[in-house]
């Protein structure tokens, strides 16, 4: 076999190969003989079909398979000889034979990039710092109370926080527009489910009162034919209900899972859950900065084949997510190209982290994996059951090991970068800051 190799770009390679036709002919004969032992044809006993008939019937198939095997072997031999790390599958291109009696072809493919690990000492990482106190516990309990709000009819004008029931009809240029009319429509004033101007118009009205008002839809309104348009609404209030929040007492504690209704235990559980969530959020924000630092310090090109494969996987994940929400993805196109930028980032990080793990021996240790699983299990009703679930299948344990490896990478990078603590508020950390 004769071969020549050339570099066509940073990661693209081309190998021209030549295989003697005599070798292929020999392989064709071998395949036909194997077929002849088992082939069945009318009028012949199994294994007794004449070779001439076998060749006439299966010759094209045998030659196609022989050529495919020869191409695969030639390419594989060359890759091993050159110690190339091939990314994706090669594109095989036939060539006009320069030598009589030879099959000539080219394999065009990509290779994995070299990943020289860069200096991280100039990179900065801010670590959020937050101690969960009584104020955070109080705020969370208040949220839990609001989630259990009940409503009671009142005889007064509607105000912020009230649930109202209305009939409404909207007109544009004197004509009803699509989606602009409803009866017995409920919503909570101030909850954000309706436009602010609409909510403001309802505020101050009592049951039985009717009001006509004008408003202008926002320029970015989702219905294009209404965006930026002035319309007129007529509304009639049919119900006004005031919110009733449950008291912080034994009943609320029991409703939130504290069997004996002890409010102190409720606060302790809320605090413990908040501390776990704060820790998770801090780790997430630090991890984001660490990954960005790795990308900045280690600029690399990535094979298109890997990016395309990752884009397809992300698109499939998005489809499954939509299906889990009850949507029919046949009517919703999800194109891999939408995820190209995300795929490039993920592939780069995957290559950089793999090199870093090998170079610095940041592999997951069994005791690390167990500690991580034990910590996760603490938020479950039956921690031991979750531990058994992870250890029941190697695939699940592999997922836990991947998380530990990622944590090891983050810890190592933090030891190499300029890290400084930054005190943040609860809302800032949770992404609720105005």
Swiss-Prot record:
GO terms for biological process: 'de novo' cotranslational protein folding; cell division; chaperone-mediated protein folding; protein transport; protein unfolding. It is an enzyme of class 5 (isomerase). Pfam families: FKBP_C, Trigger_C, Trigger_N. Its EC number is 5.2.1.8. Residues 161-246 form the PPIase FKBP-type domain. It catalyses: [protein]-peptidylproline (omega=180) = [protein]-peptidylproline (omega=0). It is found in: Cytoplasm. This is Trigger factor. It comes from Aromatoleum aromaticum (strain DSM 19018 / LMG 30748 / EbN1) (Azoarcus sp. (strain EbN1)). The lineage of its organism: Bacteria, Pseudomonadati, Pseudomonadota, Betaproteobacteria, Rhodocyclales.
């Amino acid at each position: 076999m004769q071969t020549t190799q050339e570099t066509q770009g940073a990661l693209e390679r081309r190998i021209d190969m030549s295989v003697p036709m005599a070798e292929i002919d020999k392989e064709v004969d071998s395949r036909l003989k194997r077929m002849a032992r088992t082939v069945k044809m009318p009028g012949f006993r199994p294994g007794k079909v004449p070779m001439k008939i076998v060749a006439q019937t299966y010759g094209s198939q045998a030659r196609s398979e022989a050529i495919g095997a020869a191409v695969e072997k030639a390419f594989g031999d060359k890759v091993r000889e050159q110690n190339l790390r091939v990314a994706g599958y090669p594109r095989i291109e036939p060539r006009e034979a320069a030598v009589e009696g030879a099959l000539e072809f080219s394999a065009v493919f990509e290779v994995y990039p070299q990943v020289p690990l860069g200096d991280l000492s100039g990179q900065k990482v801010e670590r959020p710092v937050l101690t969960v106190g009584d104020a955070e516990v109080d705020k969370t309990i208040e949220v839990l109370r609001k989630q259990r709000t009940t409503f009671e009819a009142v005889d007064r004008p509607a105000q912020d926080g009230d649930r109202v029931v209305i009939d409404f009809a909207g007109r544009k240029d004197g004509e009803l527009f699509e989606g602009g009319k409803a009866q017995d429509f409920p919503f909570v004033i101030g909850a954000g489910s309706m436009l602010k101007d609409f909510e403001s118009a309802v505020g101050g009205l009592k049951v039985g009162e009717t009001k006509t008002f004008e408003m202008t839809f926002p320029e970015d309104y989702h219905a294009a034919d209404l965006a930026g348009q002035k319309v007129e609404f007529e509304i009639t209030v049919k119900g006004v209900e005031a919110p009733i929040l449950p008291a912080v007492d034994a009943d609320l504690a029991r409703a939130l899972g504290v069997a004996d209704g002890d409010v102190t235990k409720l606060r302790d559980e809320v605090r413990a859950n908040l501390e776990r969530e704060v820790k998770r959020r801090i780790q997430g924000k630090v991890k984001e900065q660490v990954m960005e630092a790795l990308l900045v310090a280690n600029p690399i090109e990535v094979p298109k084949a890997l990016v395309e494969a990752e884009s397809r996987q992300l698109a499939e994940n998005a489809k499954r997510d939509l299906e889990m929400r009850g949507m029919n993805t046949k009517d919703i196109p999800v194109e891999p190209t939408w995820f190209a930028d995300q795929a490039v980032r993920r592939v780069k990080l995957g290559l950089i982290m793999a090199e870093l793990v090998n170079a610095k021996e940041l592999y997951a240790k069994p005791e690390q994996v167990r500690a991580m699983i034990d910590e996760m299990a603490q938020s479950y009703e039956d921690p031991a059951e979750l531990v058994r679930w992870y250890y029941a299948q190697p695939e699940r344990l592999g997922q836990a090991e991947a998380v530990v490896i990622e944590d090891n990478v983050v810890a190592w990078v933090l030891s190499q970068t300029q890290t400084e603590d930054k005190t943040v508020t609860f809302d800032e950390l949770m992404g609720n800051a105005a």
